[in-house]
A protein has these predicted regions:
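Bacterial Sec-dependent N-terminal signal peptides
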Residues: 1-29
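Secondary-structure boundary elements
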Residues: 297-373
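Buried hydrophobic packing segments
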Residues: 374-378
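Beta-strand-rich, non-transmembrane domain signature
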Residues: 26-304, 379-381, 385-448
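Generic secretory/membrane-interface signal
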Residues: 11, 20, 286, 306-307
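Structural motif marking the loop-to-transmembrane transition
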Residues: 3-4, 349, 411
């Protein structure tokens, strides 16, 4: 009887494996079919400027030249019936987004030939927050424009799966570009099809300077005005020209028809030195994150006032720090002993702060959420401190914020130069992580 049961289990597992393999095969077949359709649509809608080939004399010795650059972004916001409808009777808010980047690049030497002879990409990624997904399908398209005028379209049916990362758990795809030669042009695009439920989209960054010289650039956005879209132009970047289409979408356009030099290869930070535009697109209501007043205005806003955004962030800080602070009810015995011992100990404010910080850091980790309990614990112990808001390297400066989700909260012991930040391993108390060193900050010395 036991052998019969084991045989039944083995048969069941075998059938499950076959089903999984079939699903994976279907998924890949569906992806390839969709990708082929998208590529054909992109090739059939080639902008006029992608037919230009003239290169100014000053760029003829460059390794590669971007003859034309095109960026397109679109959003559509709607409600969708999901399993949530049967559980709570509510529809799920969803943003459908397409983000495409396309370049026509002239190959001038062996270095460029090597750089553009192979591409890596990820066909699909998925993450979850509060039971709602954020899915991205990426479609890559490549064709080679030969010197004699012929066009060779790269076949993606045989892309190679490559296992990378720790224990080979990260799967990416690679494709070679056969037949590419010096003097050819390569027309390449990457299209992300994104759908996200009850969440804001990841920020979009439009850099107006690239690693190669660019002769012509255009950015085109068609944005659903039911969403809250804000952007800021940095380092001399211009604003978009905004119009409205027949469907009442906001249409943003930016054209740069003058050549732009390549970024320097060394000692260069694009977020500090290159002109760029940072954009956040957020639903005005969502079930997974708090959307404060400054982020609830529908439509598109350019270079908004920072003050309301900071006020919202101070409000959020007070809420989170207070809620996650010290309360003797529900604390584990280990926590209770630590805080009672520190309350009765004859220690300086710095010593108490170092011990609380280190204890929480070791027990709970490096996240902002874990760090938030530290200042409130210290206040309960009678330690005076000042809370602060800043942003890390790579984010917009705190005095040019457009979204409070990019901020970091920290504190300083009052009357000292000792600062405490969330951070990464390894780290000691009162050490400022390099990503915050030299960054602008706002301080507040009151719990209110």
């Amino acid at each position: 009887m036991k052998n019969v049961r084991m045989a039944g289990v083995a048969f069941f597992l075998l059938m499950m494996q076959l089903v999984c393999l079939s699903v994976k095969a279907d998924n890949k077949a569906d992806y390839l079919k969709l990708a082929q359709k998208v590529r054909q649509e992109v090739w059939d809608n080639t902008p006029v400027d992608f037919k230009k080939r003239a290169v100014p004399e000053k760029f003829k010795k460059e390794s590669a030249v971007i003859l034309s650059y095109y960026k397109e972004l679109s959003t559509d916001y709607h409600r969708k019936a999901t399993t949530e409808l049967f559980i709570s009777g509510r529809l799920t808010r969803q943003i459908d987004c397409e983000d495409m980047e396309r370049m026509l690049i002239q190959i001038n030497d062996k270095k460029a030939l090597k750089d553009y002879s192979e591409f890596s990409f990820l066909t699909k990624s998925k993450k979850w927050q509060g039971g709602y997904h954020h899915t991205t399908n990426t479609i890559l398209g490549i064709r080679v424009l030969k010197k004699d005028g012929t066009v060779q379209v790269v076949d993606f049916d045989d892309y190679v799966d490559v296992k990378e990362g720790k224990k080979g758990k990260e799967l990416s795809q690679k494709i070679a570009v056969p037949g590419l030669e010096i003097g050819d042009c390569i027309d390449v695009f990457s299209l992300d099809q994104i759908d996200t439920q009850e969440q804001q989209l990841d920020p979009f960054v439009f850099f107006l300077r690239q690693s190669e010289p660019v002769l012509y650039s255009r950015i085109h956005c068609v944005l659903d005005q039911s969403l809250a879209t804000v952007y800021r132009s940095m380092n001399g970047a211009p604003e978009f020209k905004q119009t409205t289409d027949k469907d009442k979408n906001a249409v943003l356009d930016l054209t740069m028809d003058q050549p732009v030099d390549a970024e320097p290869s060394v000692w260069y930070n694009a977020t500090v030195q290159s002109p760029y535009i940072m954009m956040f697109i957020t639903p005005t209501k969502t079930k997974t994150v708090i959307v404060e007043k400054a982020m609830r205005q529908k439509g598109v806003r350019a270079n908004p006032d920072v003050a309301p955004i900071l006020q919202d962030d101070w409000k959020l800080m007070k809420t989170y720090v207070s809620k996650n602070g010290y309360s003797p009810i529900g604390l584990s015995g280990k926590y209770t002993r630590v805080f009672k011992a520190l309350k009765n100990a004859d220690l300086s404010a710095e010593e108490k702060a170092d011990r609380i910080f280190s204890f929480e850091y070791i027990c709970a980790g490096t996240s902002q959420a874990s760090f938030n309990v530290v200042p409130n614990y210290l206040r309960k112990l009678g330690v005076e401190l000042e809370m602060g808001i800043t942003t890390p390297l790579g984010a917009l400066p705190v005095d040019q914020l457009i979204n409070y989700n990019s901020t970091t909260w920290f504190f300083r012991l009052k009357g000292t130069n000792l600062y405490y930040f969330p951070g990464t391993y390894p780290k000691v108390a009162s050490e400022i992580p390099y990503i915050y060193q030299g960054r602008k900050a706002y301080m507040q010395d009151s719990e209110e």
